[in-house]
Regions:
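N-terminal secretory signal peptides and thylakoid transit peptides that target proteins
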Residues: 1-16
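Small-residue-enriched, tightly packed secondary-structure blocks
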Residues: 28-185
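Generic hydrophobic alpha-helical segments
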Residues: 16-17, 180
Length: 185
């Protein structure tokens, strides 16, 4: 097989894999389905440890994406729907989408949560029609084992993010560059 044929095969396979594994607006979840998934994800998040419960209770808002699908082979895509929670109640619904190119392979389903630790960071997020993680507002990713001493007295960043509940295997998963957009449900 020639290099150009091999390259075309890899590109076609990547696009095919991405198209078949990632949800689209045709598969958009209903409001009640999103709310149900959020309740399950919030319980799972709280069960990760007492400091996650503290972070949940002390945050000005939480952007919860209970089911994000990510997949790719060189070209990767991800998509999910969730809600912005204030006082642990959904106030607005959002989608998250990303596309990337580089060393990545596999498929994964996961949940993600972005904790807004101040009213100011929450207001900045809500003011924008769309929001790109890492470009529009800085954030710090939390490893599940790192939430040992994080509380409202030690916040040093406006936004903290965590990925949890992973199923499947996808090398190269990141939230960086993910685009969050308000949706109607």
């Amino acid at each position: 097989m020639k290099n150009s044929s091999r390259r075309q095969f890899i590109i076609a396979s990547s696009v095919g894999l991405a198209c078949t594994t990632i949800g689209t607006t045709a598969n958009a979840a209903s409001r009640s389905r999103i709310d149900s998934r959020i309740k399950i994800a919030m319980r799972e998040l709280a069960n990760l440890g007492p400091n996650f419960s503290k972070l949940i209770n002390s945050s000005a808002g939480i952007l919860m994406m209970p089911k994000v699908r990510s997949g790719g082979l060189m070209f990767g895509t991800s998509y999910g729907e969730g809600a912005l929670l204030i006082g642990q109640a959904p106030v607005e619904y959002y989608s998250v989408a990303a596309a990337s190119f580089g060393m990545q392979v596999g498929w994964q389903k996961y949940s993600s949560a972005m904790f807004f630790t101040s009213e100011n960071s929450l207001a900045r997020f809500r003011r924008n029609d769309g929001w790109t993680l890492g470009a529009d507002l800085g954030y710090t990713m939390i490893d599940q084992g790192e939430v040992i001493d994080i509380d409202s007295n030690t916040y040093s960043d406006d936004v903290y993010g965590v990925i949890f509940g992973q199923e499947g295997l996808h090398f190269g998963v990141t939230l960086e560059g993910s685009k969050y957009s308000r949706i109607t449900r």
